[in-house]
Amino acid sequence: MKNFKIKIIILVSLLFLTACSSVKTVSKYEKKENVTWKEVEPPVILLNLEPGDIIVKEKTLNPIGMFGHAAIMKNNSIIVDYPKLGNKSYTIDVDYWLEKGRDILVLRYKDMNDEFKKRLVKNMEKYFGKNYKISSNKMNTDGFYCSQYIWYIYYITAQEMGFELDLDSDGGNFVLPYDFINSPYLEIVN
């Protein structure tokens, strides 16, 4: 009976994860056309990365990467990442995080200033170290998945400064890495 319950839970989880990939949502923002992904070849040397830059990895065919992946720059060389189920967040040098054969986009908040950047980094530290957790409530801070963490620290930083900021371009229950690409508040800088 116990094995049967485990199999059912796994089956439902797989159905949920694969079903989400084909959900059609209507973007609340204009779609960006002619997006050019930056090819990653070792050695990786990315210049001009800044705190708050969002790096989106392209989607892959495997179940872990089918939604893409995103992480955020804490400073000019260190990334904060929420990698996958069973892991907590961690920091890593961007050169070690990027992988050959998986192209990236670097997105930057258009209205970044020193005060916002300072508060954003402070919030990265405040919400760092939690377990990876998938939730349909973007405001849930018990744990995070990669793109929810990025969305939330931008959201809460803007709230602290007295304005609204929603980087999720389709406004769904989940914020996925590709949702950042069409946000009017972000620009592609690679």
Protein language model annotation of sequence segments:
Residues 103, 110-129:
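A structural motif
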Residues 53, 59, 83, 124-132, ...:
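Sec/Tat-exported extracytoplasmic proteins
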Residues 49-109, 132-141:
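Glycine-rich catalytic cores of cysteine/serine-nucleophile enzymes that process amide/ester linkages
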Residues 17-19:
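C-terminal motif of bacterial Sec signal peptides marking the signal peptidase cleavage site
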Residues 5-11:
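Sec-dependent signal peptide recognition
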Residues 46-53, 68, 76, 117-121, ...:
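Extracytoplasmic/secreted envelope proteins and their assembly/folding machinery
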Residues 22-28, 32-34, 137-190:
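Activation targets extended, charge/polar-rich intrinsically disordered C-terminal tails
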Residues 29-47:
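Mixed-charge, Lys/Arg-rich low-complexity intrinsically disordered regions
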